[in-house]
Swiss-Prot record:
The protein's enzyme class: transferase
Protein name: Glycerol kinase
Gene that encodes the chain: glpK
Binding locations of sn-glycerol 3-phosphate: 17, 87-88, 139, 243
Family annotation (InterPro entries): ATPase_NBD, Carb_kinase_FGGY, Carb_kinase_FGGY_CS, FGGY_C, FGGY_N, Glycerol_kin
UniProt note on regulation of activity: Inhibited by fructose 1,6-bisphosphate (FBP).
Keywords: ATP-binding, Glycerol metabolism, Kinase, Nucleotide-binding, Transferase
Positions bound to glycerol: 87-88, 139, 243-244
Species per Swiss-Prot/TrEMBL record: Pseudomonas fluorescens (strain ATCC BAA-477 / NRRL B-23932 / Pf-5)
Annotated positions binding ATP: 17-19, 265, 308, 312, 409
């Protein structure tokens, strides 16, 4: 480890759903340089989404080379690589040629819906929830992998003979970067496959049997922070975490009760529950996160379907704003929403309601309502939905929320951040560093190779740019929230369907 002093940089590879990025960090965890390339999305049928794994690897290697060149660095100056990735996306490749036998099936792809329905008919929902922490949904890797083995001729037999390998995107990239020497994944990615027992920390024999998946094709599961292998040019690969778990670590949410919300198109909330794998009563996922040194910790995860997309709707469909950034100005022009609530259930409601038949609605309209009130109500809806999820997580875990760390595009909106603190009655902390996902991967790699000595050293680098303190009186806060709950109840079960009462 002696030469680590001469290596002053860490590279984070952030392999996302639409682009591959490389971000170089220095010893102070500042961004030195970033490179990014988009790649093609393939939609062979309605509801199907695929990526070309070779293109993912090509763009990911290209941006790494590009970032080094841009920063004027040689690979000898890099201490380690950390990888963070779009989760659940499924790749199967030939061990000898290193080529995929089918395109990657992406997390958004719904083609394995029928396989999930069969699992439900077979009464496996409770077993899946207990063992893997997940709901029975095409979102997760297991049913995607079964689909490939069912539909690519001879593939199951070849997998049994040890000729084919399965991996999520992290595994695929590491296999390619190490020239086929290393077939691994980490606990956070394994916990998204629906094939992994999150309590024993082993591949689950019953799930493999039910989905008819040969054990031979699965990667070895390791911690999120250790040296897994080296690239052909000799750089150590030292950190792996799925994107949401990497963001949780990048935000330094390593103690029970610490939570982060990523405000994107939807919102992704994760709350650390320490060494307790909490079974949710509210439809949250129980998932594996990173403990203080990349070891296994548990978290609850909940998703809000419509966050930033609600603001896009104001802009693109209603055309009442020109730019998402304008919402802060309009929301601040009025003292409140004038009794208006917008429930953005455009695609149903996610956690904790799980109602696919709910539809969006505006409530409380009177003649005094102006566009400003509607814009304000749209921003408020993002904060209300976040509270819905965090209240459920606190009930499930028995942990009190200490503070909410935030990242993602919408955190630049000061009105939204202040209202979020107000409606939660909890401090909201916005970090200076917005690249929290890549930072998490860099931290994990840096800890593995001794680039950074300890968690305490990293905590010193987590600069909070602004803290938003709650300013609403308790009675006012609860009055507003009661109005939201009433509005949500009126949107439920709107769309006609077979199971309707």
């Amino acid at each position: 480890m002696t030469d680590i002093q001469n290596k002053n940089y860490i590279i984070a590879l952030d392999q996302g759903t639409t682009s591959s990025r490389a971000i170089i960090f220095d010893r102070d965890a500042n961004v030195v340089c970033t490179a990014q390339r988009e790649f093609a999305q393939h939609y062979p049928q309605a509801g199907w989404v695929e990526h070309d794994p070779m293109e993912i690897f090509a763009t990911q290697s290209a941006v790494m080379v590009e970032a080094l060149a841009q920063a004027g660095l040689h690979h000898d100056q890099v201490a380690a690589i950390g990888i963070t990735n779009q989760r659940e996306t499924t790749v199967v490749w030939d061990k000898n040629t290193g080529r995929p036998i089918y395109n990657a099936i992406v997390w958004q792809c719904r083609r394995s819906t029928e396989i999930c329905q069969q699992l439900k008919r077979d009464g496996l929902e409770d077993y899946i929830r207990e063992t893997t922490g997940l709901v029975t949904d095409p979102y997760f890797s297991g049913t995607k992998l079964k689909w490939i083995l069912d539909n690519v001729e001879g593939s199951r037999e070849r997998a049994r003979n040890g000729e084919l390998l399965f991996g999520t995107i992290d595994s695929w990239l590491i296999w390619k970067f190490t020239g086929g020497k290393t077939h691994v994944t980490d606990y956070t990615n394994a916990s998204r496959t629906m094939l992994f027992n999150i309590h024993t920390l082993e591949w689950d024999a019953k799930m493999l049997e039910v989905l008819d998946i040969p054990r031979e094709m699965l990667p070895e599961v390791k911690s999120s922070s250790e040296i897994y292998g080296r690239t052909k040019s000799g750089i150590a690969i030292g950190g792996i975490a799925g994107d949401q778990q990497a963001a949780l670590f990048g935000q330094m949410c390593v103690e029970p009760g610490q939570a982060k919300n990523t405000y994107g198109t939807g919102c992704f909330l994760l709350m650390n529950t320490g060494d307790k794998a909490v079974k949710s009563q509210h439809g949250m996922l129980t998932t594996i996160a990173c403990g203080p040194s990349g070891e296994v910790a548990y978290a609850l995860e909940g998703a809000v379907f419509n966050g930033g997309s609600t603001v896009q709707w104001l802009r693109d469909e209603l055309k009442i704003i020109n730019d998402a950034h304008d919402t802060e100005y309009f929301a601040g022009k009025v003292k409140d929403s004038n009794g208006v609530y917008l429930v953005p259930a455009f695609t149903g409601l996610g956690a904790p309601y799980w109602d696919p038949y709910a539809r969006g609605a505006l409530f409380g309209l009177t003649r005094g309502v102006r566009v400003d009130h509607i814009i304000r109500a749209a921003l408020e809806s993002i904060a209300y939905q976040t509270r819905d999820v965090l209240d459920a997580m606190q009930q499930d875990s028995g942990e009190r929320l200490k503070a909410l760390r935030v990242d993602g595009g919408a955190v630049a909106n000061n009105f939204l951040m202040q209202f979020q603190a107000d409606i939660l009655g909890t401090q909201v902390e916005r970090p200076q560093m917005r690249e929290t996902t890549a930072l998490g991967a860099a931290y994990l790699a840096g800890l593995a190779c001794g680039f950074w000595g300890s968690l305490e050293e990293l905590r010193g680098k987590a600069v909070i740019e602004r803290e938003f303190e709650p300013q609403l009186a308790e009675a006012e806060k609860e009055g507003l929230y009661a109005g939201w709950k009433k509005a949500v109840s009126r949107t439920r079960d709107w769309e006609p369907h077979d199971e309707a009462k």
